[in-house]
């Protein structure tokens, strides 16, 4: 230890062993989140959980309302180019705490976005392991004997960075969200649209969290909410969100938006086949602006706008 070095470092440097020593997919995994006080988490970020604070160094790699962060940082600090390279949806879903860290020297894993042997925040690659975005009930109790072969998510990051969850639903606070971590979409550009078909190997994901801060713990293992899902075409949804965003700024989305989805292992948007709802057509999101997907007709636009207006007025 160097002279003058603080002995009470919050994140002490650890020696990272070789990956092969503990790379056992069937090993029993203990839950790092089983001891989290849910009451304190629900007040986050105003009353943050001491456990979640241990991951504070990773917050810069996790999603939030970038619009608010940009305005807050305009007074002085500029975002690091290194951090910007880690802020894409592709990296967060398929690389964050999944790709093995290539650094040879010992370092603090709580400050590194890559995976290390035995660390608590490690994630399974959803492209290789078929598990859903639903929290594992056994893991929430403390451990899961199935380990990496489990069909459910283990921990906060596996749940909320799962491709079927991450930014597939709008944040109820919209652009007014000021939470340090938020896995929901704050603008239509952030919203990830998934095909409306269910993959039985991956299961379903539940609706919008009951509390905006409840996303900081693993979602409970419970059936989806009873409120009926909105079922217009995806193009109508995007266009309606644009209208609400232009009219109300940071509008509040009061009702959960759920859908059974098939997990595409890419953050790029893919063609959506016609489903059981009327007035839905195939379209390519990558080739045309979202506003062009709305079918023409004053009645359809008026109906969609009135529906969203009624739902938001109830909140």
From Swiss-Prot:
PROSITE patterns registered for this protein in UniProt: ZF_C3H1
What ranges of residues constitute the C3H1-type zinc fingers? 131-157, 165-189
Region Disordered, as annotated, extends over 1-21
**Disulfide bridge map:** none
State a single Gene Ontology molecular function.
zinc ion binding
Name the InterPro entries for this protein: Unkempt-like (IPR045234), Znf-CCCH_4 (IPR041367), Znf_CCCH (IPR000571)
Q: Check the record and name the Pfam families matching this protein.
A: zf-CCCH_4 (PF18044), zf-CCCH_AtC3H23 (PF25512)
Keywords on record: DNA-binding, Metal-binding, Repeat, Zinc, Zinc-finger
* Name of the protein: Zinc finger CCCH domain-containing protein 23
Any Gene Ontology CC annotation: cytoplasm
Q: Which domain of life is it from?
A: Eukaryota
SMART domains noted in UniProt: ZnF_C3H1 (SM00356)
Keyword Repeat listed: yes
For whether the record's keyword set contains Zinc-finger, the answer is: yes
Gene Ontology biological process terms from the UniProt entry: mRNA destabilization; regulation of DNA-templated transcription
